[in-house]
Amino acid sequence: WLMIVEQKCRVIVMLAKCFEAGKKKCQKYWPDSKETKTFGRVKVFNVEEVKYCGFLRRRFHIESVDEVITMEVFQYQYINWPDHSVPNTTSNLVRMHKYVIQCLEETGGDAPMVV
């Protein structure tokens, strides 16, 4: 989260689920919906989670404790990628990509995106 604040990243894209076939694939690095969690010098509040067909969009309010920086960050998580395979169709992935591009444009688009 410190990197997100330092680089002023507004969009995070995640293409994996935390668990697949009962195995841990990724560390969950965000708080549950409507909850706040502090990571070092950065406080993260999960404002909302919206489920779309094939992906989730989370909106976070980020606050840097020592630099008094606040910002809004969006995370898009594709949840239909099968373990050790490829999706049957790309329509949901393409739809998520369009949402990501739109979000980048709406948030200024000058900061790097985290994938």
From Swiss-Prot:
Q: Which residues bind substrate?
A: 83
Q: Which organism is it from?
A: Styela plicata (Wrinkled sea squirt)
Q: What are the protein's GO molecular function terms?
A: protein tyrosine phosphatase activity
Please report which protein family the annotation says this sequence is part of. Belongs to the protein-tyrosine phosphatase family.
Output this protein's name: Tyrosine-protein phosphatase 22
Q: Which residues form a coiled coil?
A: none
| Ranges of residues in domain Tyrosine-protein phosphatase | 1-115
The entry's keywords: Hydrolase, Protein phosphatase
Q: Which Gene3D superfamilies match?
A: Protein tyrosine phosphatase superfamily
The cross-references to InterPro entries, in alphabetical order and at most eight, read: Prot-tyrosine_phosphatase-like, Protein-Tyr_Phosphatase, PTP_cat
Q: What is its EC number?
A: 3.1.3.48
Spans traversing the lipid bilayer: none
SUPFAM superfamilies for this protein = (Phosphotyrosine protein) phosphatases II
What reactions does this protein catalyze? O-phospho-L-tyrosyl-[protein] + H2O = L-tyrosyl-[protein] + phosphate
